[in-house]
Amino acid sequence: MARVTSVTLGEHLTGFVGEMIQSGRYGNISEVLRDALRLMEAREQRVQHVRDMVLAGTNAPVSHRLMDEIFSAAVKDTSV
């Protein structure tokens, strides 16, 4: 369910939002903010995934895999 929320933006962000709307990429401020929040949510999920991987590695026994193999797997796991 949609909810009306008031947001105060500084001059820089207000200008940026205006540019995005003027470019035609977005129709209004709400579209800009929703897209920005979706991107932020996705980034936070990736950060949490990396944190979980670090914690798992910290708690795991010693690995016999080469560092290159571990790094390649980590890059593959964090790719979106």
UniProtKB/Swiss-Prot annotation:
Domain of life of the organism encoding this protein: Bacteria
InterPro entries membership: ParD (IPR022789), ParD_sf (IPR038296), Ribbon_hlx_hlx (IPR010985)
A matching Pfam family: ParD_antitoxin
CDD domains listed in its UniProt record: RHH_NikR_HicB-like
Q: Which UniProt keywords apply?
A: Plasmid, Toxin-antitoxin system
Q: Which GO terms describe its biological process?
A: regulation of DNA-templated transcription
- The family this protein is said to belong to: Belongs to the ParD antitoxin family.
Record function comment: Antitoxin component of a type II toxin-antitoxin (TA) system. Neutralizes the effect of toxin ParE.
The identity of this protein, by name, is Antitoxin ParD
Tell me the organism.
Answer: Yersinia enterocolitica serotype O:8 / biotype 1B (strain NCTC 13174 / 8081)
- The coding gene here is parD
